[in-house]
Amino acid sequence: FREVMAKIGIHIKREDILEPMATGSLIWDRVIPASIADRDEKIRQCMELIPQIYKEVFKSVRPFPGLEPVLMRLEEKGVCLGVLTASRTIAVQPLHHHSLIRYFRVIMTREEGFPNKPAPDGVLECLKRMEILPNQAITIGDTPLDIRAGKAAGTLTVGVLSGIGSSAQLQAEEPTAIIERVSDLLSLFDLE
């Protein structure tokens, strides 16, 4: 996103986009001030650039260290996995590129048209497609929105600190558990 903004002449810090991404507030309000005369045009330019730049950015995305062994172990134990993201379909490209897509039974992106998190609709549809009841599921995420959506859907929730949300933001949502990194899932559920 910072690269997109730079292309239209606006330079922002990483922190400027983390809070809106974590909380669901409008990112445009944070990064393109209302005082800019051609604000609507700048937003339009960004919307055109995002798919082009993201396509290149996602080519360089690498999985978190230790992710594949975790996915392998979960698969061995019969755990059904799904992905629900507010991002575009291109955001799951790294799962294909690194041959991790095979571990996920369901992949849902914003193009499916469900209300954004914290609404539970996407979580519930993901569970429906996997034929899992909410009380048998765990929503794992790195933002307060993920935790709220999981709770609203009736699942247990796990906050992961290796992503966007801060420890304070995740703790404020009172998830079932908080872990430092995805690889901690195995010890959390005694699957080591």
Where are the predicted features?
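Residue-level marker of regulatory loop/turn positions in helix-turn-helix DNA-binding domains and
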Residues: P63, L84, P115
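N-terminal helical cap/lid subdomain that shapes the substrate entry/recognition surface
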Residues: F1-E68, M72-R73, K77, Q93
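Asp-based, Mg2+/Mn2+-dependent phosphohydrolase catalytic module
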Residues: A6, M72-E75, V79, R88-T89, ...
